[in-house]
Amino acid sequence: MSQLFKSFDASEKTQLICFPFAGGYSASFRPLHAFLQGECEMLAAEPPGHGTNQTSAIEDLEELTDLYKQELNLRPDRPFVLFGHSMGGMITFRLAQKLEREGIFPQAVIISAIQPPHIQRKKVSHLPDDQFLDHIIQLGGMPAELVENKEVMSFFLPSFRSDYRALEQFELYDLAQIQSPVHVFNGLDDKKCIRDAEGWKKWAKDITFHQFDGGHMFLLSQTEEVAERIFAILNQHPIIQP
């Protein structure tokens, strides 16, 4: 596996392929892996320009999704589940569309903390550093010591901005519904995502909604409960045949 993905558990079990939130990278999923260890083979994306991946950041979500798809080289006979949080949720959705067009069906698609693609999003990537940082901090999930050190925070700004630009500029022209079972995860205090969650019905043939305590970054505050839901999903759905 190249620098685009990190494997936490090499095995022949179902693959759980994870895509991080804006500014995140493979290590963002280590807490989740701690609760799922031995239950699946977790592959976590290391986006260009993030973590140990020193290649140039990509500010085009379609290009980034194609890059992941090419690198994964998924097989119809190997069961896998896609999981993405926030920006990673949109990548998960788009990747599922592309794979299904080629007859490769995920066992399940888990879309977490993201509004559906037809919803207009507020653009923030152009904001001055202080305002942009404030927006990121308000989403929650940032360690207090990191929030208090704006010099350290500013070090991560370029990767955050690149990710936000990719999401803000994304335009979807593929209207295909996902045929695989879709699970939508949201935090109860994430008002925008909760408000627009039903909109995902437009994009999925079979959809289930899950709610967790917390806000947009409930993945970090409710990790054990998220892991329990994912474990149930891993064991719930049979492998879909094309």
From Swiss-Prot:
Pathway: Antibiotic biosynthesis; surfactin biosynthesis. GO terms for biological process: antibiotic biosynthetic process; lipid biosynthetic process; sporulation resulting in formation of a cellular spore. This is Surfactin synthase thioesterase subunit. It is found in: Cytoplasm. InterPro entries: AB_hydrolase_fold, TEII, Thioesterase. Induction: In response to low temperature. It is an enzyme of class 3 (hydrolase). Probable thioesterase involved in the biosynthesis of surfactin. The keyword Ribosomal protein does not apply. The keyword Hydrolase applies. GO terms for cellular component: cytoplasm. Belongs to the thioesterase family.
